[in-house]
Amino acid sequence: MNFRRMLCAAIVLTIVLSIMLPSTVFALEDKSSKLPDYKNDLLYERTFDEGLCFPWHTCEDSGGKCDFAVVDVPGEPGNKAFRLTVIDKGQNKWSVQMRHRGITLEQGHTYTVRFTIWSDKSCRVYAKIGQMGEPYTEYWNNNWNPFNLTPGQKLTVEQNFTMNYPTDDTCEFTFHLGGELAAGTPYYVYLDDVSLYDPRFVKPVEYVLPQPDVRVNQVGYLPFAKKYATVVSSSTSPLKWQLLNSANQVVLEGNTIPKGLDKDSQDYVHWIDFSNFKTEGKGYYFKLPTVNSDTNYSHPFDISADIYSKMKFDALAFFYHKRSGIPIEMPYAGGEQWTRPAGHIGIEPNKGDTNVPTWPQDDEYAGRPQKYYTKDVTGGWYDAGDHGKYVVNGGIAVWTLMNMYERAKIRGIANQGAYKDGGMNIPERNNGYPDILDEARWEIEFFKKMQVTEKEDPSIAGMVHHKIHDFRWTALGMLPHEDPQPRYLRPVSTAATLNFAATLAQSARLWKDYDPTFAADCLEKAEIAWQAALKHPDIYAEYTPGSGGPGGGPYNDDYVGDEFYWAACELYVTTGKDEYKNYLMNSPHYLEMPAKMGENGGANGEDNGLWGCFTWGTTQGLGTITLALVENGLPATDIQKARNNIAKAADRWLENIEEQGYRLPIKQAEDERGGYPWGSNSFILNQMIVMGYAYDFTGNSKYLDGMQDGMSYLLGRNGLDQSYVTGYGERPLQNPHDRFWTPQTSKKFPAPPPGIIAGGPNSRFEDPTITAAVKKDTPPQKCYIDHTDSWSTNEITVNWNAPFAWVTAYLDEIDLITPPGGVDPEEPEVIYGDCNGDGKVNSTDAVALKRYILRSGISINTDNADVNADGRVNSTDLAILKRYILKEIDVLPHK
């Protein structure tokens, strides 16, 4: 098999920048007569003549706003240019930028800079080549002089410079157009024929992993679960497939099931159902022997009961890595490259988090005045790729980890794996407490510090600050202890206060047998928060142009009925008080489990129309899970209704799986924007939590199969052949949006540790990198780029890795539990003679068995077909089955 092929020219971009994109993204090597040889140029897009601009993209800062496109140059047929539209000039010259990153300047080399630029209004442009981040050293900048542009007149610049500094791999070619440089907005600036030439530099030729025709879970499949692969083919007829082992021996074969056009990927696909093959092994792969293609195969994969055993611990390790206020060190970090000093403990250059002030009063918060005070808010988890800490995002994340433990405790496995003391590799191991609760406590202790005291402001005492983060965004390639930005407490919100009440109530009941003092304090503060929220039910974290900081995400939420319900559920289950019981039973969300958010009204506007059950902004499903899981005083009929609602939601997602070519439980959103939303992978993970509970409550293995399908999509069976998890699969996530794990920014920063999941496809084009790299008509499932600058598709967060840890642990541990009334998934029911799996034994089974023995390319249930129970399926079984059908034998198996 031809597993790899050589690519050069601009496709080298996939290796140089360590990314993988749909093939439509790449420009080919240009042959411009105006520019030097492409192979000696440090830039990967120079002419824009193919309608593409990546890796050129834009940047907005300090009030700047812009847009961009590749357009035809008037009067010049066949010539295109990069057009930047300046919409708002912002406060500074760097408020509006267009730039090309991923440049290494070598000491002693001489470079030739060339570009043509023009505008439709008189303005100035400051061009520079220098560092992407602090201290922003500039190696070329036209001697600090901006270029003056006259309307309609092209300016061509050509200059030489020598790199007299040490070699620097953190460089970018940038044009600043904001602030004092700008004309009256809006206006256009055009860029074309841009080059950075070094005769001593040669673009490398690298090998790029092609996308195979057969898409599989690149890690593997559980033996007992249903197993599907997806074949990309426009054939309308079944295709022959073969499953081979690591010794290249055919162990199973059959014919594909044509499915036609898959809407979300725009691929024509078939399915391979090899569910009945349960033999454990490593290195299996598929081949399509009748398909004349260099890619008529799959990546290798395993079939094993332990494929998630390491993954679940890697997923949980993410939270230790994201701790604030503590050094990340060996032996807990997993490798020296991932160690770092403690961040935000009040040591310069940090401006936090031991004495963080409230946000200064301004127009943004005119309706939400707050007094000036400072708080020690050390600890907690950094939310994502930045250094912000957010209560609402941390709330659903810490709930998920504690729910993992609570379910394990109720199911009788809390003394195993990550749940037991000493099971996780964290500093608190062997302290007498369950490790996963220790990790959750790190966040809960931070939450406590975010609550307003009577002394600080009696008018809002008990309320909780929404978030704490930097005043402005910092650049990638910055460790937490290096962050120089001022940090502020953003105003309190009802949503944050109710997240606090819910999770501290949950924490109280889980800690009461281990640390009663801590548990009592959690409950006391949770009840204070509840009363404060009742007093201030409408302090919303609204979205405003500046609500991101701009040094943090807004996490806006203007509907909190779901948070009130969730908090009441947790407080009721912990205390049994009628106050909370009455509140939750009268909530419009009582016992609700959304299948598609917003259907019953009240969901956060950002989530309405999205397939899924809960997010940081839509939380009623969390409360319903708690009521269904934990013993409480509700009527038994209500608890059963909650469990039924969980199963009903899961059933709708199983229907989606059967409709989707790549068998995933979400479909395109049914809101005004459609497509796939930010964090689409997290919607799937949260759905899988609900599927897990549906299996717990019903014993129906179809929900386990749905979880396996979801994992297969995330681990490679998708339109991009992409595993969205670091360290797992043939094409794993490599370049998440993170300020530390960012080797694309500089080689001095490490690749990410294993077990981290990316947000995944987002067809709403919400960052400049994805907008520059992927065409707007790209199918939603393919709107993704594994690039450190793409925060809207490649972000990593605590509230996404938490469900990833939950799901991997569940699938790894499922063999430890048999649900009430259920069947042990390791021992599925065998109906001897039912070869075709229709629940009956008749002549059609004999025909199927005969065709299987003759290798006619069909799949059968081999367990059922082994009618003499000798562990083999052969002509002896066929003879016995015929006798049984003719009633010459009364019972199967017959030996």
UniProtKB/Swiss-Prot annotation:
Any Pfam family matching the protein: CBM_4_9
Temperature dependence: Retains 97% of original activity when incubated for 200 hours at 60 degrees Celsius.
One GO term (biological process): cellulose catabolic process
Principal location: secreted
Domain Dockerin: 828-894
This enzyme's EC code(s): 3.2.1.91
CBM-cenC domain ranges (all copies): 40-199
Signal peptide boundaries: 1-27
Enzyme active site: D386, H737, D786, E795
CDD domains named among the record's database cross-references: Dockerin_I (cd14256), E_set_Cellulase_N (cd02850)
Chain positions covered by the region annotation Linker: 199-240
Top-level taxon: Bacteria
Ranges where the record places region Catalytic: 241-815
InterPro entries, A to Z: 6-hairpin_glycosidase_sf, 6hp_glycosidase-like_sf, Cellulase_Ig-like, CenC_carb-bd, Dockerin_1_rpt, Dockerin_dom, Dockerin_dom_sf, Galactose-bd-like_sf
Disulfide bonds: none
GO cellular component entries: extracellular space
Mechanisms controlling activity: Inhibited by cellobiose.
Keyword Coiled coil annotated: no
Location of this chain's protein in the cell: Secreted
pH and activity: Optimum pH is 6.0.
Gene Ontology molecular functions: cellulase activity; cellulose 1,4-beta-cellobiosidase activity
Keywords: Carbohydrate metabolism, Cellulose degradation, Glycosidase, Hydrolase, Polysaccharide degradation, Secreted, Signal
Catalytic activity from the UniProt record: Hydrolysis of (1->4)-beta-D-glucosidic linkages in cellulose and cellotetraose, releasing cellobiose from the non-reducing ends of the chains
Database matches in PANTHER family: ENDO-1,4-BETA-GLUCANASE
Family in the record: Belongs to the glycosyl hydrolase 9 (cellulase E) family.
Protein name as it appears in the record: Cellulose 1,4-beta-cellobiosidase
Organism this protein belongs to: Acetivibrio thermocellus
